[in-house]
Every structure is written in C-alpha cells, then in structure tokens.
Amino acid sequence: MARHEFQTEVNQLLNLLIHSLYSNKDIFLREIVSNASDALDKLKYLTVSDDNYKNISFTPKIDISFDDKDNVLVVQDSGIGMNDEDLQNNLGTIARSGTKAFLEKLSSDAAKDSSLIGQFGVGFYSAFMAAKHIDVITKKAGSDGKIWHWSSDGTNSYDLEEIGADSDLTKKYGFDDSALTGSAIVMKLNDESKEYASRWKIEELIKRYSDHIAFPIYLHYDQNKYDDKGNVTSTEKKVDQVNSASALWKRPKSELKKEDYNEFYKTIGHDGEEPLHYVHTHAEGTQEYTTLFFVPQRAPYDMYQADYQSGVKLYVKRVFITDDDRELLPAYLRFVRGVIDSEDLPLNVSREILQQNRILETIKSASVKKLLGEFKKMGEAADSAKKAENPTDEDKAKIEKWNKFVANFNRPMKEGLYSDYANRDEIAEIVRFKSTDSSGTGDNNWTSFADYVQRMKTDQKAIYYISGNDEKNLRENPLLKAYIDKGFEVLIMADDIDDIVIPGFGKYKDFELKAVNRAGSDEELGVDKKEAEKKDKEFKPVVEKIKKALGDAVKDVVLSKRLSAESPSCIVVDENDPGFQMERMMKAMGQEGMGVKPILEVNGDHSLVNRIKQTDDEALIKDVSEVLLNQALLIAGVEIKEPAEFVKHLNNLLA
C-alpha cells in the first residue's frame, strides 16, 4: 500500500471541515449521493454514445447500507468508477486555480460557509464532517479491470493500493463480478455522527435532499420480527427504493412545490441556501425541450475567474451529456445554475457538434430571452414595491430579492451590454447604477436608465455619468457640482468594467451617454459663449505657462467653464482616448498601459491659478502647476507617479 500526501489546500480544507464547519452536517450525504449520480450519468452517456461501452452490462442504481453496531455508512454506485490516476486527481488534490482564494473566503462562520463547500466542488471531502475514516473501493468501466482501494482518516495523507479480485473488500462490495463497475464509499462514522447509521435518518435525508435523483436509490436494512414479549425472533434483509427517481424538470409544474425546486437546486448547485429565483420552461413545437434555471442567492466563488465552472447541465432525452460546456449560456450569465433537456439533439452529440448545432443555438437564444425577461420583471416588481405608501411584507420581500440580485449580478449583466448585441436593449432595462439623484429608486440610490430618463430635464439631450474606481471619490469630484447645480442627474459608475462597457453601449433609446469627466461633455451647461471667449483670452498666458511647466505629463491644459469657485482644477480624458479605468485594468492583467494622458482643466476664479497670472517666477509656476495637476489626479482616484515630488511642491507653496 503506497502512502501519498494530500495537496496542501486539501489539508487546509479538511481541517476546516472537521474542526469548524458543523452548521449543517447533513449535507455530506447529499454531496456523496450527488457524486454517485454524476458517476452514473457519465457511464449512461458512454453506453449510448461510445461503441466501446454499448455492450457492457449496466444497471444504474445507488445502494446505501449501514451497520449501526460498528457505525459504518456505505454509499455504492454502479457508475463510471475510478482508476488510480482518477483517485489521485479527484481525491488527493483540488485542481482549481482559485483554491487559495476559496480557502481564504472560508471563515469560522459555519452557517455561511457550508454553502461554499459544495460551490467549490469538493463534496466528497464534506464526508469527513461525519466520518473519522473513509475507504473507497472502485473499478473503472472500460478499463483494465483493476480494482483500487483508497483510504484516509482525513489527516495529511491517504493510502492507495490495487486489490485483487479475491480480496475481502473486493468480494464484500461485489467487484469480483467482472461486469460490475462503480465506487463504494465506506464511511466509519465519528462518535458525534452515529445517528447516520440509522434507517430513518438516511431515509429522511434522501427524501429531503435527493428524492429527485434520476436513478433509483436503494436502502438496505435489517428488519426484526418480535414475539409477544418484544423479543427478536428473526431478522429479515430488506431493500427499499427511497426516492422517486424521476427527473424533476420533466414533471409538470403544477405537480411541483417551491420546496421541490429548492431541494433540487441545492443538489445541482451544491448550495446550502435556497435559490434567489427559478424559472421552469417546457417548450413544444418545432423543437421540444425543457429548461430549469436557478439564480443563486450569492455570486459563485469563481464568477470572475477565467476557468469558471459552467453551472448548467445538458441532457438529451434525460441522458446526461455534459456539465462542462460554457456555450450553453453566454458568459455574462455564468452565475445561472440549472438543466437543459432536449428531445431533438442526437445522443452521441460531440463537443464540436454542440458548438455549431442549430438546435442548441435556438434553445440558447430562447433561454437567454426567458432569463432576461424574468430579471426585468424582478426589477419592475421591486421598483413598483418601493413606490408603495405602506409597503407590505410581500413588497419588502420583492425589494430585498432585487437588491440581492443587483448586489451580486449587476456587474456580469453589464458585461452583457457590451458582449450581447442582440439582447442589449433588454439588458439595458435590467442593469442598475448609483446616482446623484437624492430620491433614488433603490437602496443607496440605485437607478435604471428608464428611471433616469423619466427624471430628466425637459430639453435634456444626453444621459450623464462619471466613471472611476471609487464611488466616494467620484461623488466628491468637483465636476459633479456644475451638473447638479444646473439640475442634471449624474450616474456614478465605479465598476472597473464601466469604462469599457458604457462607451461600447453608447446610447439608451435616443439619448447618448456622456461622461462628465471626458472632454466635450459640457455643452448643455449653458455657458455664456461671449464671456467664455473673453475669459479664454484673458487666461491664455496662464494656460501656456502651466502647459510649459507640466510638459508631457498632460495632453492639454484648458480653462474650465464648469468648475465652481472652491475647486482650482480637475482632470478629464479626451473624447477619443481610453479612460484611466481601462489603463488600470490592462496593468492589472500584466499588459503595458496605453499611456493615457489627462487634460487639465484650471479654474480662472481660484486664487491658486491667479498666483500664476501674477508672476513670471518659473519655480513658483512649476510648484503651482504640479499641485494643480496632482491634487486633481488624487481627487479623480488616479495614482500619482511621484508622491514625494508632489509633497515637495506643496511644501514650497506652504513655506
């Protein structure tokens, strides 16, 4: 028997599971049964799609047995099974790039963290919450027939060995039958978990969490017979099927309760929480298919990772095809969990065929429109509830539901504005933004484009926004005051993708979107042109002095027509240049920046600017110019290149 060390991250996870996360220990059985179902799905698919597997003997089922004297619980499936390489990859390591971040996210808050465990796809390890030792006996279908024994107590290492057809373990779990494949998970329960070696506890958990599993789950138990005095006279071996074994999504919606959907979601979503929303659709006609989609309460841990795991499973006539195809829904809907089941796709469809299949493309298109329609209705229901004079509990629930959606999924929905041209009008009704409007239409002044337009001034020609990396900084930007004073509402866009998405989106209905921190966005402020020309002429020497002092640090210096008296300067970006957010994103991705240079606007009514007007002292002009630029950069949330130099110039002015 060879001993192997667990990957460091597995050790950390097991330590958390065993010592910290006890809030909902019951989920371990749900996770083990779900894994067994996945193993059956995979083999079932191979038996209909791969000639090498079509003639194997395959009876899909899950068997659960227990020993209440030795406190042992066994879950065995007749699925795909594993070889030694699979065991090392699946049960010895966590091959995910986000492992470290996930473990950092886990905390001592057990109620919260239990849902994260399954999200990360480490359901097997959750068994160590109840078991002090686990043995896995397994044989892989279509392989060399070798039987493997994996064993661990969850501390630091595991043992792995090949066992013969004549070994006791092989015979005990039936793997001496050459036709039998699959895995047996043998859990020696710890002292605090003896209740799981009980017929009634197992049956209760299967009915609660796994009734919808599409394969039969059989519970093996001993039933005693008693005489009149209560003495055991005989014991009979019994086997009962304890789940309904029907694909929940294929059942009529009228037969299903909210609880049925919730428990199904917890299994396929590996989540301890109920879904935020679900939508169940049966489509008939040219194509026949069923979709059942769920929106989680919280964003999946890997939503912003390049190797995020797709949350949608594809079935054909209830035969599992794949759960690893990101083409089933567009990337901006990667937080959606659920099932697509087609009656028309071929069973032996390959990954390459899927990517070009018209049937699947039609299903995808209809599914996206259905989901977007549901999201829009959620938002409208919440907005309507917010306007109620005396909101009911139902109104409050609608508002809370929508606020959760916005808090978790507003950013990926914005990605859709940029990437999904066909549906951008629908997405534009869903996305929300912070705003300078004091009434707002949601908590913390979230608003929609539609509500912004309703509040616009009568002759207003554009939707105004300001973008940057920090909401607080943006709200304090001196540019805002000019627009607010003139009665213009400004959207606050502090997401790192806003500088990419919004210019690409461009217009909402007939209204152009204009960034107030870009040049050329001040035409509606009602500036007196004659007065502006007079002032430009008066301050032209001042502007030239500042340009000379700053050199290549700026693209241009102009006299501002919108700053209030207390603000000496601000920076804007040229209409045709990428924003500072784009620059920041590129550098964060290890790419060379585009060298965006700001345009410095200076306020001729401010005393600091007038100090330059009154002097030809080049040192003083340099000090004032550097302070005007760098304080404007700081207020805009842009990193200054030489902080020490800035402080030196500031001190010179204060001396």
Predicted segments with their positions:
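GHKL (Bergerat-fold) ATPase N-terminal catalytic module, capturing the glycine-rich phosphate-binding loop
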Residues: 1-191, 195-196, 457
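GHKL/Bergerat-fold ATPase module in large chromosome/replication-associated machines
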Residues: 116, 134-177, 190-195, 200-655
